[in-house]
């Protein structure tokens, strides 16, 4: 009781008279750039500005937090970094060169983005076939930015575990993601942009625990797993290629090679980060998207490395369009409507008030027609509307996306509600 009393007094005193100190994990803002905590026992930091990068041992006023699972980054190799340093990393990434450069740009962006209120993290979404080395790829990314004792994680079953992981890391990697529900998709968006998770306080009926969450994310999976356009909009999609059986090397051997190469690779990344900071004030995105700060980083990478203006930005924008389209088309209503429209000119089953390019009926008639498609597969899908009213609401949400697929939806009100499906050829 006396110990608790003393703790309470100390807490009260610090709340009223103590100084507020801003602390950071792994990456912190500083004048003209960032400082990166190497996590070593000598408390050394890497300071990156537009003038270059350097190791700081003493004199930094930046306060870093360290958690038990944090592991140290090695000291980068001495000297000025070059493109050859970055090329050392390519042998560990089974991707095409454009994807490789986009990943390098993502690494730089994450290293230059501390957890502050205004920052937004782009989610690295790896899509891979079996045998592409996606887990090793993910592990190496963590070892370059934010190594921890936990490493790659499986997605937890409760929000509290998600919050704890986010609070004690700069980057969290989730392995073998599958079809993500809307709840999980929204949660991942919240992690990337920053927010607050709530949970019931232990041993109480109405107490609430608040967990501030903000973290960079790496997701990987074999199948298409991003199904919400809002999540897709925040991602950098990267496809990994299968490794030929004749080219396979044991993971332990690859990791040994990587640990030898890591100081040189980090030197190259820190140098590129400095070059990006130098270029940022003079660039403007040619293909701005929702995550516009990442577009600016891509523009700065183009300027720093002599890549034709807009090359990386255009590729990023194109990939976003593809992943968003895949996400929209995975919606069961969207999928059913596309199938319905494709079959309409040829299938007498839909001859009710229709011609070759148009169908008109009530919402109930459309619900029945869509539900009967493909062996009634849609009707038994839990995500498919169970009433005509719900279907009408979903169609209004999907109206613009359907139009992009050449399907126009018109809503008419007379004595009865009517929906016209028109195919624009």
Which ranges hold each PLM region?
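Segments of Walker-type
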Residues: 1-98, 225
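P-loop NTPase catalytic core of nucleic-acid-dependent motor ATPases
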Residues: 52-168
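Conserved catalytic/switch belt of AAA+ P-loop NTPases
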Residues: 146, 185-209
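AAA+/SF3 P-loop NTPase mechanochemical coupling elements
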Residues: 162-165, 201-219
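Short glycine-/polar-rich loops that comprise or flank the Walker A/P-loop
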Residues: 168-170, 195, 213-216, 230-235
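Conserved AAA+/SF3 P-loop NTPase catalytic/coupling segment centered on the Walker-B
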Residues: 171-192, 224-233
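A short helix-turn-beta junction within AAA+ P-loop NTPase domains corresponding to the substrate/partner-engaging
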Residues: 227-245
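DNA transaction DNA-binding modules
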Residues: 276-425
């Amino acid at each position: 009781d006396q110990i608790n009393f003393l703790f309470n007094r100390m807490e009260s005193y610090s709340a009223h008279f103590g100084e507020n100190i801003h602390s950071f994990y792994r990456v912190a803002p500083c004048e003209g750039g960032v400082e990166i905590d190497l996590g070593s026992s000598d408390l050394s930091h890497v300071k990156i500005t537009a003038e270059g990068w350097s190791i700081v041992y003493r004199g930094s006023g930046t306060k870093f937090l360290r958690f038990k699972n944090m592991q140290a980054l090695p000291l980068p190799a001495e000297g000025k970094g070059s493109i050859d340093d970055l090329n050392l990393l390519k042998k560990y990434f089974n991707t095409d060169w454009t994807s490789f450069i986009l990943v390098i740009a993502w690494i730089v962006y994450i290293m230059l983005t501390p957890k502050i209120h205004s920052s937004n993290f782009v989610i690295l979404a790896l899509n891979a076939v079996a045998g592409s080395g996606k887990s090793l790829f993910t592990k190496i990314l963590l070892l370059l930015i934010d190594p921890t004792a936990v490493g790659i994680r499986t997605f937890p079953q409760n929000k509290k575990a998600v919050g704890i992981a986010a609070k004690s890391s700069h980057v969290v990697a989730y392995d073998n993601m599958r079809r993500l529900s809307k709840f999980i998709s929204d949660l991942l968006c919240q992690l990337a942009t920053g927010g607050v998770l709530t949970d019931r306080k232990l041993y109480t009926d109405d107490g609430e625990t608040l967990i501030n969450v903000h973290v960079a994310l790496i997701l990987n999976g074999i199948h298409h797993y991003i199904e919400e356009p809002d999540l897709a909009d925040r991602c950098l999609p990267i496809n990994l290629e299968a490794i030929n059986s004749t080219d396979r090397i044991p993971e332990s051997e690859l990791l040994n090679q990587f640990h030898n190469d890591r100081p040189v690779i980090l030197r190259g990344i820190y140098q590129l980060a400095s070059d990006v900071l130098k270029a940022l004030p003079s660039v403007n995105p040619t293909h701005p998207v929702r995550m516009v700060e990442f577009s600016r980083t891509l523009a700065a990478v183009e300027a720093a490395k002599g890549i034709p203006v807009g090359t990386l930005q255009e590729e990023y924008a194109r990939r976003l369009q593809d992943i968003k389209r895949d996400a929209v088309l995975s919606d069961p209503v969207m999928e059913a409507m596309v199938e319905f429209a494709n079959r309409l000119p040829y299938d007498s089953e839909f001859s009710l008030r229709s011609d070759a390019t148009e169908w008109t009926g009530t919402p109930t008639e459309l619900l029945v027609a869509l539900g009967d498609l493909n062996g009634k597969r849609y009707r038994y899908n839990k995500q498919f509307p169970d009433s005509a009213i719900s279907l009408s609401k979903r169609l209004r949400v999907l109206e613009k996306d359907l139009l992009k697929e050449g399907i126009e939806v018109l809503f008419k009100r007379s004595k009865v509600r009517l929906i016209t499906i028109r195919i624009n050829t």
